[in-house]
Structures are given as C-alpha cells and as structure tokens.
Design a protein with these regions (language model features):
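Helix-boundary and loop/linker segments of multi-pass membrane transporters
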Residues: 4, 74-78, 108-116, 145-146
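Transmembrane alpha-helical segments of multi-pass membrane proteins
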Residues: 41-52, 81, 115-126
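Alpha-helical transmembrane segments of multi-pass integral membrane proteins
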Residues: 53-60, 85-100, 121-130
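Transmembrane helix-loop-helix hairpins at the membrane interface
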Residues: 19, 98, 102, 112-248
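Membrane-helix interface/capping segments
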Residues: 67-73, 103-110
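N-terminal, membrane-interfacial amphipathic/helix-forming hydrophobic leader that caps
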Residues: 1-73, 144, 151, 211-248
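Membrane-interface helix-boundary motifs at transmembrane edges
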Residues: 32-41, 106-114, 170-173
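Alpha-helical transmembrane segments
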Residues: 3-13, 78-92
Length: 248
C-alpha cells in the first residue's frame, strides 16, 4: 500500500498533468469545435489527447482517498433530478449557442454531415474532461481548503476560462465570458446535485450546439494572388481577408 502522504502527492501530480494536458489541447487539434477535418494522423492526435485524459482521470480517481465525498466525482445521488437539470442546462446552452453564432458571425453555419462524428467526440470527450478536472477535482479541492462556496465557484470558473483560452487560442472577450458562465453553471450544478452528471450532460449538449452553429474551421486571413493574365493589369490579383472567408 502507498503511504497516504505519498498517495496524496501523486494525486496532486497527476491532476497537474491533466491540467497541463488541457492547456496543450491546441497542439493535439482537440477540445475545440472549430478544428479541421484531417487525415488519420490528425485524428490519431485527437484520440490520443482524449485517451490520455481518460487515463489520467482514472488514475486521479484511484489515488484520491475520498473522490466521491470530497470531490463529488460521481454521477449524482438523485440521477433523475441531475438529468433533468442537465437537460435544462443543455437547452439553455443550445439557445445561447445560436445567439452567440449570430452575434459573432452574423449567421448560422451548419457543418457538413461528414463532420458530425468528430463533433460528437469533441462534445462528449471535452465535456467529460472539463467537468472531471475543473468541476470535480479543482472545485472540490477549493471547497476542501475551506473557501466559501461563492469564492470557490468564481475561482474555479476563472481558472477554467483561462485554461480554455490558453488551450484553444481564442482571444475574444465574448468567448472568455462564455467559458466563465459555463464554469459557474457547472459548479452550481455540482453543489445542487452532489455530482458532475448534470454539469456533464448540459456541457456536452452545449458544446455540440457550438459545433452545429460554429463548427466550420476558423481560418486566419489569407492573401492569395492569382497569376496575372496579359493585358489584365491588376485584375488577376485579389486578397481574401478575414471577413471574406465564410464558415461553411
């Protein structure tokens, strides 16, 4: 048997590794709805990220002496109530995703059907990763340390929003506030239900709604210059800017 101090130290170490993996999600083309379709190497990279996250989650759960009572790493004592709250959260998330898509892009951009399997993987895998780490481990540790509930909720949401921003490269204030709201709602649901099931269900639905409304890859501004045809002057040259590239 591992001595308890060493066991807890290992728990903190593996939790830190999982946090670092979340920060490095962009390198694996994972954890964001706007990743490109790609060849098998890209898919292998994405799957390795989700697989590593699941493995770390299992190790963390095994190492902590009281993962259920202290970290709420369980579905919920009342699963029916948790499921109802999760679906309600998801419904609000769907509405929010459509509003956000119109606000940011001016229109809804539905992805091609061939991208749906990746969208499902993104939604379910990332929601589990985030809820386990941020609403389970991190939020639970903040409560164990004696922080008031409101301060623990705000701190966990702030750290979560910063981690998502670092891991996806998004820089907009609107998206940052969006992740903050997701973090706050998830933590509140954990307090209400005693588990992460409601937060996971609602988060997964919300992320899939993001994929459905903003699922086509974001691209940086690209400058393309066509060969000039004789006698055409500059007619053959054109620039495609950020506003000229549509999602869809």
């Amino acid at each position: 048997l591992i001595p308890e101090p060493l066991q807890y130290l290992l728990f903190v170490g593996f939790a830190a590794l999982m946090f670092l993996l979340r920060l490095d999600a962009r390198r694996f083309s994972a954890a964001e709805w706007d990743t490109e379709d790609g060849e098998w190497r890209i898919w292998l990279s994405r799957l390795s990220w989700y697989g590593a996250g699941l493995a770390l989650a299992l190790i963390i759960f095994a190492l902590h002496p009281s993962p259920v009572s202290e970290l709420n790493l369980t579905l919920a004592p009342d699963r029916g109530f948790a499921m109802a709250l999760g679906l309600l959260y998801g419904a609000a998330g769907v509405v929010g995703a459509f509003v956000l898509a119109v606000f940011l892009n001016g229109r809804i951009s539905f992805p091609s059907p061939g991208r749906y399997p990746g969208g499902v993987l993104f939604a379910v895998g990332t929601a589990f990763f985030d809820e386990f780490l941020f609403r389970g481990v991190l939020f639970g540790l903040l409560l164990v340390l004696g922080l008031p509930e409101w301060l623990a909720i705000g701190s966990a949401a702030f750290i979560y929003a910063g981690a998502v921003r670092a891991g996806t490269g998004s820089r907009g204030l609107v998206l940052l506030l969006n992740w903050m709201i997701i973090g706050v709602i998830g933590s509140v649901l954990v307090l209400m239900t005693g588990g992460i099931a409601a937060a996971f269900v609602g988060h997964a639905i919300t992320r899939f709604a993001f994929f459905m409304t903003m699922g086509t890859p974001r691209r940086a501004a690209v400058e393309q210059v066509q060969p000039r045809s004789r006698g055409s002057g500059d007619a053959g040259a054109y620039v495609i800017g950020r506003r000229d590239i549509r999602r869809g």
